[in-house]
């Protein structure tokens, strides 16, 4: 509920917050707010669930994770960065660049050879990246919308979106920010999607 609260208390108010829950029970301590729409699911889509209810969405789209404390100006900054790129790019706070050369074909190559731009670290520019972390991502629907139907594996949603963007010819960029502009909430490590991929 803390990430949801941080997104509902933004300097630039959001119109709607769609929460996909990989369970049949509503999470405890969610705030009561008419902008919050909760979708429960018997099927566990893992992090792909961020895209389960996106069809038909118009306007600015920001995807989020439940373990991040979003700063008060997060939505305002992200929308500003989308506009800086003329609504023609995906922007994010966490991302990675892949090496040039032969294609990366194994998970071990991906984890060892990529150059990560971690969301808690200061970043001075609008660096182009190959992959954006979908917990810190924004774009405009004019680019189109990634479809959950095209995501054939779980816990790899960042890679699915990167492939979608590459096929659409959509660029991805990091945003400039100060150190610890965003932080993580404490959570048991085994509950994290990233830990489940190891």
Question: What does each model-found stretch correspond to?
Answer:
Residues 1, 24-29, 100-101:
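Short, charged/polar "capping" segments at the starts of alpha-helices
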Residues 1-3, 24, 52, 82-85, ...:
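Catalytic phosphate/metal-binding cores of nucleic-acid and nucleotide-processing enzymes, i.e., regions
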Residues 2-15:
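Short, acidic, metal-binding catalytic loop of nucleotide-sugar glycosyltransferases
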Residues 15-16, 60, 171:
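Residues at the starts of beta-strands that form the adenosine-phosphate
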Residues 18-59:
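Active-site-proximal specificity loops/subdomain of glycosyltransferases
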Residues 58-69:
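Short beta-strand-to-loop acidic/aromatic patch adjacent to the donor-nucleotide binding site
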Residues 69-149:
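Conserved catalytic core of nucleotide-sugar-dependent glycosyltransferases
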Residues 141, 146-198:
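C-terminal catalytic/acceptor-binding lobe
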